[in-house]
């Protein structure tokens, strides 16, 4: 039977056009990749009763439920409502599913609720960003990782957020065992050295990983109360020029990161190639075309950076060129 399917409309509603004729797949957003287990029952119900009985865990930490008939999209949207509300996802009209799919699900490592290496709660920050930028049709990818280990591979995204800390030293607790300097040399970048029987931190070299904090047996090193981040830019995969994101701002605060991302939507709306296939153009290619300085002007508009923030004077990307 022939069906009149508006492909752009169903894609915007977070359904995929699949290779199976007459069938689609529902894409479920999970900001920060953390899902209360009660919602698993809803996903299972949709998969078993309206899909093909399987669920795909996506690279962006969401769920994709394949094998859904086009005529069942409305009922699937209705069933997804408790999940959407439970995850506090912005939704202009209840019961209609997701209102956009351009801005991708924000991914994150498990963060400091579980991992001792993480410098902050990645899921909470991911949800905070989600509230500011979704729904939107522009193609943005944001990822968060708790520390410089970068388990979430954030340098492959448009915006990568890496947790940092400024280690605080209490000399009265130090027994000069040398554990911090040894671990910094072996596991990090040797930003500590022993001077007059005390560790001395090279502020220019330190990447804020917190290895010294984790390995000090007397808790002479502690994490800073303030949360800091490294913001990376315009990493990407793809056919033309895959590349890793480069540093934009070091020791930046959360509020400034959100403002920069929001500002970038205005920048993209101004410079995107309207004639690009599907009306989509990767942000990185727009920056390549306009130049970094123009992007920087838009990104930092009305941003009040903290005194510790270090903004890159310029950024150069390389990667692999297939053209």
Stretch-by-stretch model annotation:
Residues 4-34, 104-111, 245-247:
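Short glycine-/aliphatic-rich beta-strand segments at the starts of folded cytosolic domains
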Residues 15-19, 159-163, 229-238:
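Short beta-strand elements
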Residues 26-175, 179, 183, 204-207, ...:
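Small-residue-enriched alpha-helical segments and adjacent helix-cap loops
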Residues 52-59, 90-94, 139-141, 191, ...:
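Flexible, glycine/charged-enriched surface loops at secondary-structure junctions
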Residues 166, 179, 187, 196-199, ...:
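A structural-propensity feature for long, helix-poor, extended segments
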Residues 179-201, 211-228:
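Iron-sulfur cluster-binding cysteine motifs and their immediate structural context
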Residues 227, 235-275:
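A hydrophobic, small-residue-rich beta->alpha segment in the mid-to-C-terminal subdomain
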Residues 291-323:
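C-terminal, charged low-complexity interaction regions
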